[in-house]
Amino acid sequence: MAKTTKSFLALLRGGNLGVPLVILCILAMVILPLPPALLDILFTFNIVLAVMVLLVAVSAKRPLEFSLFPTILLITTLMRLTLNVASTRVVLLHGHLGAGAAGKVIESFGQVVIGGNFVVGFVVFIILMIINFIVVTKGAERISEVSARFTLDAMPGKQMAIDADLNAGLINQAQAQTRRKDVASEADFYGAMDGASKFVRGDAIAGMMILAINLIGGVCIGIFKYNLSADAAFQQYVLMTIGDGLVAQIPSLLLSTAAAIIVTRVSDNGDIAHDVRHQLLASPSVLYTATGIMFVLAVVPGMPHLPFLLFSALLGFTGWRMSKRPQAAEAEEKSLETLTRTITETSEQQVSWETIPLIEPISLSLGYKLVALVDKAQGNPLTQRIRGVRQVISDGNGVLLPEIRIRENFRLKPSQYAIFINGIKADEADIPADKLMALPSSETYGEIDGVLGNDPAYGMPVTWIQPAQKAKALNMGYQVIDSASVIATHVNKIVRSYIPDLFNYDDITQLHNRLSSMAPRLAEDLSAALNYSQLLKVYRALLTEGVSLRDIVTIATVLVASSTLTKDHILLAADVRLALRRSITHPFVRKQELTVYTLNNELENLLTNVVNQAQQAGKVMLDSVPVDPNMLNQFQSTMPQVKEQMKAAGKAPVLLVPPQLRPLLARYARLFAPGLHVLSYNEVPDELELKIMGALS
């Protein structure tokens, strides 16, 4: 028991249970009857809390400095309403005993503030309700709605500006992260304020309804239950009801004012006092003009001379003081410049790792006319397509592609975009931001009016048309593609060609974690057989030739077995390809038939001799064997021809070669004829039928 008590007290000291207990106590006031003395304390606390919130709202330099305000607004509104319930219970049960039955605070507001006259009190209460409900609350609610909408609409532009500053080196990564959090917090704050303003409005409506209920109920109870005269019942219950209403409505008005001040703040430089000094009182000429007007009114017969003369003197003195400030500012300017220079020189020396911007694996920069493609209001078309590209590439290669960052770049042309891989520009293009791309197909007939151009990704001739021409282009057989899809297709092409470069050590860890979940013992054996450097070479060799790492269990099994014979990453990759031969050849097979080109005997013998001689002379990688320049020129002309001939025949371009020649010829195919797939004899499954279309000579 003692231990439990100590733990509970420790939680209280840590502040973990403080707020929940306060909320539970507030809710308990609805059920439990409260003595008048406790009501006095709670009403006083309610007024003090409202004053504190108002002062914090006035002194806050920007709304995010008081981000807790929506929550406080909800709690204080709930507290005020529960106090209304508790005080109503006391007034109706014990109001016949006299005005002091509901507590000293309610009695004081009923007697002192409204002079003991229930008519005056009723009028004052109605005026307060009009000010609170119609003026302050209504305006704050509207401003909250507009601020929330505009803040959400401005988020993409603010994020782009942060990314632009980061790219330009104006801020570091930590500062960019802080700014992004501020932008998100600002959106959350104004969204919460939009809802919190409904609390204030509901509180004002509830105050009017509670007043009416207390008024009618109290008078009826006094007359019919306690046999009071109508005049005595009105005098007694109405004064307590009005006092109760004023005690609740004054804090409500203070909080409504605080809410209005928070949502109307547009400056991030200082509090309200600072803004008043630097904006309202900044111009001496305005103050002198107001001084003259006050003096003229003071000398008009029948006017109260003293108040106008006092304000005339006060405004004149303020204007004179403000006119002296520019001179003082000039006197301090030189010392300020010296101080600024010293600070700048000191800050320039504070260079650390944190100030060096990190290189992002993949990023897409947009000109300002293309920024609309990532606008939430338009459905984020580019963001969604880029996310789809990342998903498809990750699924196809069996590795998680890094996130593709999208940002605005003011250095680009308005309709230009650029794709960066590891911080280096891989490609760029300029497309009409407000047009659609019409791509001709085999079923296209006729020509459509538009701007002729080329597809940024593949260089095919296209026509850029207006959105209104889309239906016509589709009817003519064109494929119509929007700007977001054009950019996403280009990103897809570029990223696929850089997959091996994007695969790094951390990806090996994630890949092996995946393997451990499926085959824990195999993962341990693989880690013992090959280190990360060796594995990275093997995985990159496979990805370079488009071999997916999805079947990591089979790949790991082969690597563990083959690593006892060799550590050469090319030979290890060849063994993996042999194990995955069915998945590798599957895209090229038509009806169990594989159509290929081969090497003629003369070329095959020549290349075999070159490879054998190179290996005898020293350790040379199979894909880096030196070849005669004339033979390279021959490959440069014949390999593209083989590729085009097979594509023209409707076949997948495949070149079948001996195993020891495959790494070398696959490298040349990537250089001279991208898309020409090089297979070795032993990579063809036994059940397939080979059809030789020709021979490379």
Swiss-Prot record:
Gene3D superfamilies according to UniProt: FHIPEP family, domain 1, FHIPEP family, domain 3, FHIPEP family, domain 4
Keyword Cell inner membrane listed: yes
Swiss-Prot/TrEMBL keywords: Cell inner membrane, Cell membrane, Membrane, Transmembrane, Transmembrane helix
Membrane protein topology class: Multi-pass membrane protein
Compartments, as annotated in UniProt: Cell inner membrane
GO biological process: bacterial-type flagellum assembly; protein secretion
Residue ranges crossing the lipid bilayer per the database entry: 19-39, 40-60, 66-86, 116-136, 204-224, 242-262, 280-302
GO cellular component, one term: plasma membrane
Free-text function comment from the UniProt entry: Part of the flagellar gene cluster Flag-2. However, the Flag-2 flagellar system could be inactive in strain 042 due to a frameshift in lfgC.
Family recorded in the similarity comment: Belongs to the FHIPEP (flagella/HR/invasion proteins export pore) family.
Protein name as it appears in the record: Putative flagellar export/assembly protein LfhA
Species this protein is from: Escherichia coli O44:H18 (strain 042 / EAEC)
